[in-house]
Amino acid sequence: GLGNNAFVGVR
């Protein structure tokens, strides 16, 4: 999603 991009980077 929009802000989810950052979360994906952490994963």
Swiss-Prot record:
It is found in: Secreted. The keyword Secreted applies. GO terms for biological process: neuropeptide signaling pathway. The modification Arginine amide is found at residue 11. GO terms for cellular component: extracellular region. Its main location: secreted. Keywords: Amidation, Neuropeptide, Secreted. Myoactive peptide. This is Callitachykinin-2. It comes from Calliphora vomitoria (Blue bottle fly).
